[in-house]
Amino acid sequence: MEQVVIVDAIRTPMGRSKGGAFRNVRAEDLSAHLMRSLLARNPALEAAALDDIYWGCVQQTLEQGFNIARNAALLAEVPHSVPAVTVNRLCGSSMQALHDAARMIMTGDAQACLVGGVEHMGHVPMSHGVDFHPGLSRNVAKAAGMMGLTAEMLARMHGISREMQDAFAARSHARAWAATQSGAFKNEIIPTGGHDADGVLKQFNYDEVIRPETTVEALATLRPAFDPVSGTVTAGTSSALSDGAAAMLVMSESRARELGLKPRARVRSMAVVGCDPSIMGYGPVPASKLALKKAGLSASDIGVFEMNEAFAAQILPCIKDLGLMEQIDEKINLNGGAIALGHPLGCSGARISTTLLNLMEHKDVQFGLATMCIGLGQGIATVFERV
């Protein structure tokens, strides 16, 4: 079976969804920009040699509809002979895109693929056009479709206090801002055109979603966002609404070396699981355990983790049940996470994987794990190994 390697991984800056940098930039343009950039950064691979493009996106309607993967590829002037498909596993879409491409390469059906994802939550809101079947309420609690309430449920089940959530959220912003100031994101962010507050067109090379002024004291003043009576989850401890895209060049190790391209990491194992929709945020626990089992590793073997921060109330139970509470500051989301950077749904799987690869190199660790929860009760995880 072919070894699957990540040759390159990049992303756009994360823009605020409400009047942010990309308010006049379409999702297809964000995607096409990264496709062009990946190919330009790796000229040894001709675009025509790509076997497929796998692109994650959740709200596949309006500008994100009608197979945005293909539309973006056409905009990027990828040869017409290269196919493209849009993947949807909700929050795990672009990580699923990676898994789909990896399996094609493992079986010998492909040698080189572009993978990634996008979500413009400012142009296509998360709730746009959603119409759940009424019959679902016979099998699933109605609140299972409200992500904030599933986070409230996890907080109650696992004893996650408001104070713990506020502290974790403040940490996310502090870590992300420190990473920005130190240049830790420079290797992953591709400058991207957008508009500043005055409408001036400029190139953005930083995440505008981060709020460096965030403090635990300020977060403590916010009202509960989903359960106004007894809730603990606030807007400040939830992932920010943002617009962005991320992309990776995935190849067989043999083809990469044949072309003189240096692999950055191998895909060691992959896993996806289902869980109770009412605690959808718990999905990373069984997904990570399964991925580790497939890799023949334990959590202690992993040097750094990237765990998507849908909510502080959601990620803390996952950290706890993976036995990592004492290692948060050494191993978990060292450059902040979605609470600070935002969670553009279809983009996030590739985004956290991209950040993870850079952290693995910076920390000089052999193994890294990226994982995320998925709305309606799923979890997805990938173990990477440095080459």
UniProtKB/Swiss-Prot annotation:
Catalyses which reaction(s): an acyl-CoA + acetyl-CoA = a 3-oxoacyl-CoA + CoA
Subcellular location: Cytoplasm
Any one biological process term the GO annotation gives: fatty acid beta-oxidation
GO MF annotations, alphabetized: acetyl-CoA C-acyltransferase activity
Top-level taxon in the UniProt lineage: Bacteria
NCBIfam families: AcCoA-C-Actrans, fadA, PRK08947.1
Function noted in UniProt: Catalyzes the final step of fatty acid oxidation in which acetyl-CoA is released and the CoA ester of a fatty acid two carbons shorter is formed.
Protein name listed in UniProt: 3-ketoacyl-CoA thiolase
Organism whose genome encodes this protein: Escherichia coli O1:K1 / APEC
Name of the encoding gene: fadA
